[in-house]
Amino acid sequence: MRTIDLKSPRTDAARLIGGGAVLIASSVLADSAMEHYRGSFANPAMVAPLAASTVSIAVNSFAGDGRSAGSFAPASHAAAAAVGTAGLGFHVYNILRQPGGLTLSNLFYQAPIGAPAALVLAGTFGSLSHRLSVGKNSIGPIDLGSGRWLAALTAFGIMGTVAEAGLLHFRGAFHNPAMWLPITLPSLSAAALAKAALTARGGTITTALLAATAAVGLVGAAFHAYGVSRNMGGWKNWRQNLLAGPPLSAPPAFTGLAIIGLGAMLLMSRSARG
């Protein structure tokens, strides 16, 4: 049996990646619970993302602990990605079947594309974290240990989250200048990560941008909580205002992706040192 070094940089990176996946899955769990409750769970399949994200949170909590998550981990990560992919299909179908099809109005008010896509990311990153934690540095020709593929995938995930935030903040007419923060800072972070993936070099600027992106997720949740409080009745009327106000669960996805990006940076630093 392969011996797992629980103090190696690779294991530390696996913990960061798994921790980021926990945050993404937590965001999906809270968001899908609220939105599918709003839809009265009209389709029995609407329960699936709640179950998949809950299992993903539990399994990813063991990230970096070698085999402590057991052989169940790969199956749970695959299931999360599969449920997310199916949900993405359902949501796209829901948008296209509306009058006018793929219009801004339908993208604004119909089933969000970003939520199931985030579950795909949680499953994917969870799987990568597990492979690294058990000493598997590659998937076929893809070298996970270098951190470059992980950085590229994280940059893609950040830009997808930026697109979702941009769409919904555009719906809100960017009435608060702070609504530009999750568009600008994470975009710079994604660009820096993409460059690092191409050159195999990150640096302090990329790390600083990732830290800023993580902070944007936390600050965004606070702004959204304030937005909920501004609705009639404030937090005393939380049952209605949580559904009507800005989603509390959305911004922390930036934090999760930024933490995963830091894991990729750690792998690249280790690879550069040989």
Regions found by a protein language model. Give the residues of each.
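Short amphipathic, positively biased membrane-proximal segments
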Residues: 1-274
